[in-house]
């Protein structure tokens, strides 16, 4: 079974309180999502591969550890996932970016892909899938399935807020994918919103309703 890592660092909790507030405007909301994403990335890359190299300081030669040449990719689930990309890139600037867009057919309830653009060598990369909200878990699970079908092997999922229902579904369908989240909230309401949540992340990021 995959691990679920709830990142309860004081800075994450502080910024999360502001991102939840209905009084936080779109501009500040975007910046907070970026900052929380950066802090989550710090945790999600704790097991990143490293190499030992020799460098020369102004005083002497010494050995240091640096991130290895392992390739990475960031894949946001459109559209809200785009708000997390800059925060991740601030720590992993060399990562390639893919995009996945999908929706559910109202009659069949099956996922319908409307956009998918990934690095050509996705099978060689460590992949972090990002989406601010993990509610029912359907979109995240479908995106992970699509990535695996296209060759991706080493996957992680990173979200700001999740519901227990979403975590359960992703773990059932993808027991090999670890989940990094700033908060595991109480539940989903009858409309499928996370409670207490933060509302619709996409609408708040882009000022739409």
Swiss-Prot record:
<dbReference type="GO" id="GO:0006223">
    <property type="term" value="P:uracil salvage"/>
</dbReference>
<comment type="similarity">
    <text>Belongs to the UPRTase family.</text>
</comment>
<feature type="binding site">
    <location>
        <position position="79"/>
    </location>
    <ligand>
        <name>5-phospho-alpha-D-ribose 1-diphosphate</name>
    </ligand>
</feature>
<dbReference type="GO" id="GO:0005525">
    <property type="term" value="F:GTP binding"/>
</dbReference>
<dbReference type="InterPro" id="IPR034332">
    <property type="entry name" value="Upp_B"/>
</dbReference>
<feature type="binding site">
    <location>
        <begin position="199"/>
        <end position="201"/>
    </location>
    <ligand>
        <name>uracil</name>
    </ligand>
</feature>
<keyword id="KW-0342">GTP-binding</keyword>
<feature type="binding site">
    <location>
        <position position="194"/>
    </location>
    <ligand>
        <name>uracil</name>
    </ligand>
</feature>
<comment type="function">
    <text>Catalyzes the conversion of uracil and 5-phospho-alpha-D-ribose 1-diphosphate (PRPP) to UMP and diphosphate.</text>
</comment>
<keyword id="KW-0328">Glycosyltransferase</keyword>
<dbReference type="InterPro" id="IPR000836">
    <property type="entry name" value="PRibTrfase_dom"/>
</dbReference>
<feature type="binding site">
    <location>
        <begin position="131"/>
        <end position="139"/>
    </location>
    <ligand>
        <name>5-phospho-alpha-D-ribose 1-diphosphate</name>
    </ligand>
</feature>
<dbReference type="InterPro" id="IPR029057">
    <property type="entry name" value="PRTase-like"/>
</dbReference>
<keyword id="KW-0808">Transferase</keyword>
<dbReference type="GO" id="GO:0000287">
    <property type="term" value="F:magnesium ion binding"/>
</dbReference>
<keyword id="KW-0547">Nucleotide-binding</keyword>
<dbReference type="GO" id="GO:0004845">
    <property type="term" value="F:uracil phosphoribosyltransferase activity"/>
</dbReference>
<feature type="binding site">
    <location>
        <position position="104"/>
    </location>
    <ligand>
        <name>5-phospho-alpha-D-ribose 1-diphosphate</name>
    </ligand>
</feature>
<feature type="binding site">
    <location>
        <position position="200"/>
    </location>
    <ligand>
        <name>5-phospho-alpha-D-ribose 1-diphosphate</name>
    </ligand>
</feature>
<dbReference type="InterPro" id="IPR005765">
    <property type="entry name" value="Ura_phspho_trans"/>
</dbReference>
<dbReference type="GO" id="GO:0044206">
    <property type="term" value="P:UMP salvage"/>
</dbReference>
<keyword id="KW-0460">Magnesium</keyword>
<keyword id="KW-0021">Allosteric enzyme</keyword>
<dbReference type="Pfam" id="PF14681">
    <property type="entry name" value="UPRTase"/>
</dbReference>
<comment type="pathway">
    <text>Pyrimidine metabolism; UMP biosynthesis via salvage pathway; UMP from uracil: step 1/1.</text>
</comment>
<protein>
    <recommendedName>
        <fullName>Uracil phosphoribosyltransferase</fullName>
        <ecNumber>2.4.2.9</ecNumber>
    </recommendedName>
</protein>
<dbReference type="InterPro" id="IPR050054">
    <property type="entry name" value="UPRTase/APRTase"/>
</dbReference>
